Amino acid sequence: MSESDPVPGGRPGEVERATALSGELTGQGVHGVVLAYVDTAGIARVKTVPTAKLAAAAAWGVGMSPVFDTFLADDSIVGTDVLGSPDGDLRLYPDLDRLTMLAAQPGWAWAPVDRITQEGAPHPACGRTVLRRIVAGAAERHGITFRAAVEVEWVVGRGDAGGDAFVPAVSGPAYGAARQVELSDCAADLLAALAAQGVDVEQFHPEYAAGQFEVSVGALGPVAAADHSVLVRQTIRAVSARHGLRVSFAPAVLGQGVGNGGHLHLSAWRDGTNLHAGGTARCGMTAEAESFVAGVLGHLPALTALTAPSPASRLRLRPSQWAGVFTAWGRETREAALRIVTGTAGIRDRAANLEVKPVDLAANPYLALASVIAAGLDGLASSAPLPEEITGDPARLDPAAAAARGVRRLPVTLTESVAAFRTDGVLREALGPVLADAVIAVRLGEAGSVEGLDDDGVAAAYRWKY
């Protein structure tokens, strides 16, 4: 993965490398390279260049309007003081280190992009650039690096269902072998495609909701982990389409029931040592890891504007559904917003991590990871104390006892999340004013777009957007 921002004309050796890659891709029958980024609403937007134009894209980028930073999921446009107008242009620069032949889309390759201005400066609303900057800052100021992974949950619907209806393509029970058998051919093709693309799959299994599945991948650096989240979903869509199926990663496809999550797994490391294991603090954490977790916990209400950013997210964030809707943490407690994963004895030094549960796949993965890391670093820098651990379901706590222990419900509406984000100076500073204002404008636009709809209407509005 490229560690520096693109420059007009290309980084040293970049154009020559792109020329060589173009020849290799052409020789393998690749005709087009998909250039992908994720907008503020969490939608993956793309442009394609013919394989022969890859070197030109590496040198001078590909034009795209900055207006997409204030697109809503339904493609309507809101605005800020800086973004949302028809003016201006940006350049999309492919990260050649992440260039991937798409095994499920013969003739195609894929690459994530960084966005810079026509003058060659980093675009202030580029989430990938912001995440890279925050990660670099952590290494410079604290000597800390991170490993991250994003879980991917989705539902599989019948491709021949009428209109925008969701009809589960499988009927087996949650986590059941019958469901795996029903999707056997498609699942085998998916695993083969991911392996061919270099994606390290840890697990694949049926999930709880009707027609729901999950894939978990190995941990990488945060930018690469976010890239993989986008690539995995692209691959799932492509494989499923070849089998006549329709998939959705939306937080909720129905007004009731369990939704799709996108839990973040994150661990902080220094000099090759995992700070979440081998320490003398609770759950084997080091004192620094405890403070990092405390920072994430303290910023959780505002974080939901970035990690659970859709009106449909609220249909998923319900108590007692393992969605983590209370400001609580616990060791292997799946109802807590923050789950401390200690790992199995013998591999804890590499397996221990923090799982952030109030996250779904309507989130821009770059912004979600950037904001969670920024929150944790704030706690680490201030040596923030981690409150008492919670066991069991926080929803069952007596209200007075919950209040005394600092356990409170996360924002119930998207506008409440925005209000918390507005007052969170740490997160706003981490994103920068241009991007922070875009987040607010897009979230309020999404909330307004579904005003008056019941839960079923909200679910239907976002069912096939993600």
UniProtKB/Swiss-Prot annotation:
Known catalytic reactions: spermine + L-glutamate + ATP = gamma-L-glutamylspermine + ADP + phosphate + H(+); spermidine + L-glutamate + ATP = gamma-L-glutamylspermidine + ADP + phosphate + H(+); putrescine + L-glutamate + ATP = gamma-L-glutamylputrescine + ADP + phosphate + H(+); cadaverine + L-glutamate + ATP = gamma-L-glutamylcadaverine + ADP + phosphate + H(+)
Positions annotated to bind L-glutamate: G259, R316, R334
Disruption phenotype: Normal growth on defined Evans agar supplemented with ammonium chloride, sodium nitrate, monosodium L-glutamate or L-glutamine, but no growth when supplemented with high concentration 200 mM putrescine, 50 mM cadaverine, 25 mM spermidine or 25 mM spermine as a sole nitrogen source. Defective formation of aerial mycelium and deficient sporulation on defined Evans agar supplemented with glutamate. Nitrate, glutamine and ammonium supplementation of this medium results in increased actinorhodin (blue antibiotic) and prodigiosin (red antibiotic) production.
Pathway of action: Amine and polyamine degradation; putrescine degradation; Amine and polyamine degradation; spermidine degradation; Amine and polyamine degradation; spermine degradation
Annotated residues for binding of Mg(2+) 1: E151, H263, E355
Domain (GS catalytic): residue spans on this chain: 127-466
Tissue specificity of this protein: Expressed in mycelium.
Cofactor note text: Binds 2 Mg(2+) ions per subunit.
Cofactors that this protein relies on: Mg(2+)
Induction context: Expression is induced by exogenous putrescine, cadaverine and spermidine. Induced also by ammonium limitation, but only with a simultaneous low glucose level. Transcriptionally regulated by EpuRII.
Alphabetical keyword list: ATP-binding, Ligase, Magnesium, Metal-binding, Nucleotide-binding
Molecular function via GO: acid-ammonia (or amide) ligase activity; ATP binding; glutamate-putrescine ligase activity; glutamine synthetase activity; ligase activity; magnesium ion binding
Residues binding ATP: E202, S267, R334, R339
Biological process, per Gene Ontology: glutamate metabolic process; glutamine biosynthetic process; polyamine catabolic process; putrescine catabolic process; response to polyamine macromolecule; response to toxic substance; spermidine catabolic process; spermine catabolic process
Xref: PROSITE patterns: GS_BETA_GRASP, GS_CATALYTIC
EC number: 6.3.1.-
Binding site for Mg(2+) 2: E153, E207, E214
Function description: Involved in the catabolism of polyamines. Catalyzes the ATP-dependent gamma-glutamylation of polyamines. Substrates include putrescine, cadaverine, spermidine and spermine, with a preference for long-chain polyamines spermidine and spermine. Is not able to compensate for the loss of glutamine synthetases (GSs). No complementation of the L-glutamine auxotrophy of an E.coli glnA mutant. Involved in morphological differentiation and in the production of secondary metabolites.
Protein name: Gamma-glutamylpolyamine synthetase GlnA3
Source organism of this protein record: Streptomyces coelicolor (strain ATCC BAA-471 / A3(2) / M145)
Classification of source organism: Bacteria, Bacillati, Actinomycetota, Actinomycetes, Kitasatosporales
Gene that this polypeptide is encoded by: glnA3
